[in-house]
Amino acid sequence: MFAVIIGLSIGIGLPMQTAINSRLRNAFSSPLLSSMTSFTIGTIFLALVALLITHSLEIGVDLIKNQPWWIWVGGLLGVIYLTGNILLFPHLGGVQTVIMPIVGQIIMSMLIDNFGWFYSPTHALNIIRILGALLVLLGVFLAISAQKLFSARKEIISDNSLLQNSNRNSQWFWRIGGIVTGMFSASQTAINGHLGTVLNSAVKAAFVSFLIGSIALWIIVAVVEHGYHFSPAFNRKFPWWIWIGGLIGALFVLGNAYLVPLIGTGFTVVIVLLGQITGSMLVDQFGWFAAKRNPIVPLQVLGIILMVIGIVLIKLF
């Protein structure tokens, strides 16, 4: 039960991070620069926590030599997932940009559980777990798109008008890309979980993941943005909380690294996903962190119920 509470909590926090980082993005006028700043703040936070708990950030050379190469790429996969979402939105619209990576997350998490990839705990795939995964996907779709179905399809029409300007084959390319980025996200969860076991510290694993991701983003920003332009964020007055998105993201990665060895990748992914969808609905309902208010509709509640049923099936079978 404690693991479930952690998973739900970090999942609920993720949409709050998204809302916060959207304001940070406005401050910098650059999604990449805001992501780099968020990652860097999260890295510093995790370094301090790791020093407080383990009294060291050192990783032995022998450990690096004796472990598989993929154990260090979790942070890079996180950056690919983050950047992928930025690239997907103009081509797929709001709904599909959320749905496609989630499809990839669930598919990959079930495969990781079934085959024990990345040294994750093994949970054999069966028809009941597949049914549970399908219910989770249906619940996600209802929870995300219900407001659009209830609002005379205005936003869906807007999305469709955007998509009509794109070639259909191109749309499928981006849909597959969305699924692949979701699979990378699930892989990151499993990899960081094993890294936490190897380092005997989930905190240190989260720090390594964030550090590598931060380095990658600093390089990407230097190439794409031709430098680091921080002054716009300080020339205008913004609320203090625009800087805490990285802390929430750090806790998210830390929570995942802690949970995977305990409950497996598949269950971790779907529990966190339930928290994520619930958090999104709360942000919409109450307009937290200056987000636009979108009151919850009954179909979204039905979506949450279906997700819970699906999660129970995945857990019990």
Task: State where each predicted segment sits.
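Hydrophobic transmembrane alpha-helices of multi-pass small-molecule transport proteins
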Residues: 125-146, 296-315
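Structural signature of hydrophobic alpha-helical transmembrane segments
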Residues: 1-14, 62-77, 128-138, 174-179, ...
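Membrane-interface interhelical linkers
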Residues: 1-9, 23-26, 32-36, 40-70, ...
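Hydrophobic alpha-helical transmembrane segments of multi-pass membrane transport proteins
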Residues: 12-16, 20, 69-91, 184, ...
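Structural motif at transmembrane-helix junctions in multi-pass transporters
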Residues: 26, 30, 84-100, 197-201, ...
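C-terminal transmembrane-helix exit sites in multi-pass transporters
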Residues: 101, 107-127, 278-298
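Hydrophobic/small/kink-forming positions within alpha-helical transmembrane segments
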Residues: 15, 19, 47, 75, ...
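Extracytoplasmic gate region of multi-pass secondary transporters
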Residues: 181, 185-193, 197-198
